[in-house]
């Protein structure tokens, strides 16, 4: 190699070193100036740590609390042992967005051993990482093992026995964590009417209570024939036995307290009071519940409760089958009257939900400030008098957080 060729090689090498060094410098500078935009350690683009807070709405500082809840009702922090004996039980109330949430549970949770969901199959296999036992009891994992859309009364009496049978052994050490979703009662009612109008019946539901199903006299049908397809909203509202009325309270309450479906056991006013208070208590004691109208907040509280992360953030949909229903004020008032217990429960549930979100968000921000202050104190770039909380995050808006009309 002559001197000319040697000089050309040296110049080329120096040029490549300069280019590579410049690229690395720009990457480091870009990450420092705009952290979180490029995230090498976060699969599926899901932001972790402080950046992950930016996808969640800032609590409304002007929110006025309606009910008093002690800290024990606001604090939800479960050491969920997926390798142990813990089981999440999803109580799926019709037309609350439970199908979408149920799919999130089997397809969108970051797990050591993800659920095995195969095309064409209605159920996924959700085994624990260390053995072939399920950690999730839901429609998309175990199927309707306790009956179609089993309620609180059915699930609490059925789930332990079903799992013992499936796993061929009795386990008294299992911990069951019940979860559910609620929805604005008027929107939910209209969505159920639309669903029934298209031919849905849920007539295979068991409604098991105190060891038996209700008699035809206790639970008369609203229609003759195979289904109620084509029914008008007026017909739907006029049936006094319609299980759509106050469905959320009925499915969350302990029906044994009122004689199940036998309406003659307890006077109507007392029955309503017992059902509402029971539903409130059971909802309050659940490990977690979400609201259809607040998808991002629902995601946030679930993740913080169970220490499980979703791969993709939840989306809020406002285009639904119930959205196109034009109602006058009298009809809306009639639906609210038919669902008076659900209206009261939802008002209670929404307030508790918002207070839990505010409380948990406050704890997270406090923890981040402490970590940021600790990092700033030990930072080699720290100057005297500098540090503190750093630049505050701009407030984010709830993603379409208004009451939506359906699911």
Curated annotation (Swiss-Prot):
Tissue/organ expression: During early somitogenesis, first expressed in floor plate and somites. During mid-somitogenesis, expressed strongly in somites and more weakly in eye and hindbrain. During late somitogenesis, expressed in eye, hindbrain and posterior somites. At 24 hours post-fertilization (hpf), expressed in lens, forebrain, hindbrain, otic vesicle, anterior spinal cord neurons and posterior somites. At 36 hpf, expressed in the retinal ciliary marginal zone, brain, pancreas and weakly in pectoral fin.
Lumenal side, ranges: 36-407
Record InterPro entries: Heparan_SO4-6-sulfoTrfase, P-loop_NTPase, Sulfotransferase
Record's subcellular location: Membrane
Active site: 149 (proton acceptor)
Glycosylation (residues): 262, 318, 329
Substrates-to-products reaction catalysed: alpha-D-glucosaminyl-[heparan sulfate](n) + 3'-phosphoadenylyl sulfate = 6-sulfo-alpha-D-glucosaminyl-[heparan sulfate](n) + adenosine 3',5'-bisphosphate + H(+)
Keyword Iron listed: no
EC number: 2.8.2.-
Transmembrane segments: 15-35
GO terms, molecular function: heparan sulfate 6-sulfotransferase activity
Binding-site list for 3'-phosphoadenylyl sulfate: 92-100, 183, 191, 315-317, 321-322
Keyword tags: Glycoprotein, Membrane, Signal-anchor, Transferase, Transmembrane, Transmembrane helix
Cytoplasmic face residues: 8-14
Pfam families linked: Sulfotransfer_2
GO annotation, cellular component aspect: membrane
UniProt: substrate binding residues: 122-123, 139, 144, 149, 195, 202
Top-level taxonomic group: Eukaryota
Listed SUPFAM superfamilies: P-loop containing nucleoside triphosphate hydrolases (SSF52540)
Mode of membrane association: Single-pass type II membrane protein
Family membership: Belongs to the sulfotransferase 6 family.
Function in brief: 6-O-sulfation enzyme which catalyzes the transfer of sulfate from 3'-phosphoadenosine 5'-phosphosulfate (PAPS) to position 6 of the N-sulfoglucosamine residue (GlcNS) of heparan sulfate.
Protein name: Heparan-sulfate 6-O-sulfotransferase 1-B
UniProt gene name: hs6st1b
């Amino acid at each position: 190699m002559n001197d000319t060729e040697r000089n050309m090689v040296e110049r080329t090498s120096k040029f490549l070193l300069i280019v590579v060094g410049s690229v690395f410098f720009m990457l480091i500078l870009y990450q420092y100036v705009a952290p979180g935009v490029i995230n090498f350690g976060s699969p599926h683009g899901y932001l972790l740590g402080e950046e992950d807070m930016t996808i969640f709405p800032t609590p409304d500082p002007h929110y006025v609390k309606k009910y008093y809840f002690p800290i024990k009702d606001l604090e939800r922090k479960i050491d969920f042992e997926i390798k142990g004996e813990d089981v999440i039980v999803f109580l799926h109330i019709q037309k609350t967005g439970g199908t979408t949430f149920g799919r999130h549970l089997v397809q969108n949770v970051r797990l050591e051993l993800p659920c095995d969901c195969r095309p064409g199959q209605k159920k996924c296999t959700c085994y624990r990482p260390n053995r072939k036992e399920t950690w999730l009891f839901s429609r998309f994992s175990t199927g309707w093992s306790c009956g179609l859309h089993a309620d609180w009364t059915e699930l609490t009496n059925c789930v332990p026995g079903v799992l013992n049978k499936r796993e061929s052994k009795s386990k008294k050490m299992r911990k069951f964590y019940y979860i559910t979703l609620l929805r604005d009662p008027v929107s939910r009612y209209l969505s159920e009417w639309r669903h029934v109008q298209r031919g849905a019946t849920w007539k295979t539901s068991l409604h098991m209570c105190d060891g038996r199903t209700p008699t035809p006299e206790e639970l008369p049908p609203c229609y003759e024939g195979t289904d109620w397809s084509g029914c008008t909203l007026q017909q739907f509202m006029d049936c006094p036995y319609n299980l759509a009325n106050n469905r959320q309270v009925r499915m969350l309450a302990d029906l044994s307290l009122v004689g199940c479906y036998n309406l003659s056991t307890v006077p109507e006013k007392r029955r309503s009071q017992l059902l509402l208070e029971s539903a409130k208590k059971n909802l309050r004691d659940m490990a977690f519940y979400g609201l259809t109208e607040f998808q991002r907040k629902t995601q946030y509280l679930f993740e913080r409760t169970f220490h499980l992360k979703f791969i993709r953030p939840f989306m809020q949909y406002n285009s639904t089958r119930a959205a196109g229903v034009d109602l006058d004020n009298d009809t809306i008032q009639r639906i609210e009257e038919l669902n008076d217990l659900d209206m009261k429960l939802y008002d209670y549930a929404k307030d508790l939900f918002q207070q839990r979100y505010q409380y948990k968000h406050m704890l997270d921000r406090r923890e981040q400030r402490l970590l940021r202050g600790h990092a700033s104190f030990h930072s080699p770039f720290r100057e005297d008098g500098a540090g503190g909380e750093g630049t505050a995050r701009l407030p984010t808006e709830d993603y379409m957080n208004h009451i939506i009309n359906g699911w």
